[in-house]
């Protein structure tokens, strides 16, 4: 009985899952575990973000946010991402299998495969929801401008390479 009360108390203090995006009858969810600054320079602050990742399905209309009635399947262990909070070089790196993939983000002109990274970036760096109606103005108010580098590249050590991402062959 004591372990049940402890588990309920821990769950009550945990942040609510955040909706990342929904597509093709499936939604991606994230539940933050930690968000720690690990290095700062004049170019920006590198953050190590740990979160549980999950998925749910829907039939008709996707949910607009978390509701306790939504069954979410959570992956284990928690996923780690590196986020370079920078007005001039915003970027996010995530693990894909055994590789690290980094997305350099032009937050005003995102290809579809960068949207989840932009959502994670804005939440990690500013606590801002990318889905808000005035997102372009909100990003300008935060100091971002259109036209920053946009691309995807494979890297080996995100904690080192995020400040100077190599160029991809397509850039």
Where are these predicted regions, by residue range?
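N-terminal secretory-pathway/extracellular module detecting exported/lumenal segments
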Residues: 13-171
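Sec-dependent N-terminal signal peptides
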Residues: 1-11
């Amino acid at each position: 009985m004591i372990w049940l009360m402890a588990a309920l108390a821990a769950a009550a203090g945990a942040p609510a899952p955040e909706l990342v995006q929904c597509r093709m009858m499936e939604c991606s969810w994230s539940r933050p575990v930690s968000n720690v600054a690990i290095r700062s320079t004049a170019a920006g602050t590198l953050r190590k973000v740990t979160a549980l990742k999950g998925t749910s399905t829907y039939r008709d209309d996707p949910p607009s946010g978390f509701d306790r009635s939504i069954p979410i399947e959570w992956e284990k262990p928690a996923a780690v991402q590196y986020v370079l909070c920078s007005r001039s070089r915003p970027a996010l790196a995530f693990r894909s299998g055994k590789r690290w993939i980094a997305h350099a983000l032009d937050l005003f002109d995102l290809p579809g495969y960068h949207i989840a990274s932009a959502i994670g970036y804005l939440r990690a760096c500013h606590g801002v929801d990318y889905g808000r109606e005035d997102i372009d103005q909100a990003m300008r108010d935060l100091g971002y401008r259109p036209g920053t580098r946009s691309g995807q590249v494979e890297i080996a050590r995100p904690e080192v390479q995020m400040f100077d991402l190599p160029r991809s062959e397509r850039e």
